[in-house]
């Protein structure tokens, strides 16, 4: 049997609509996130420039280019969010 002094009540849930809990990212967090997405986009772009000797290479190249541009745009969005 547990002693009554060790009994703990669960805390009340936090009201996320409360203005005290508005979440903002700090500048270093935004810079790291933007750098990571932009770097990933640049890497994907550089990999899309490598010639492919496979069937449907144009489709694969455009798919990788689309991902690269998406990552770069996400990085820019993350920076100015």
UniProtKB/Swiss-Prot annotation:
It comes from the Eukaryota. Pfam families: DUF4536. GO terms for cellular component: mitochondrion. Keywords: Mitochondrion. Its main location: mitochondrion. InterPro entries: DMAC1-like_dom (IPR028036), Mitochondrial_unc_protein (IPR053092). Induction: Differentially expressed during meiosis. It is found in: Mitochondrion. To yeast YDL157C. This is Uncharacterized protein tam6, mitochondrial. It comes from Schizosaccharomyces pombe (strain 972 / ATCC 24843) (Fission yeast). The lineage of its organism: Eukaryota, Fungi, Dikarya, Ascomycota, Taphrinomycotina.
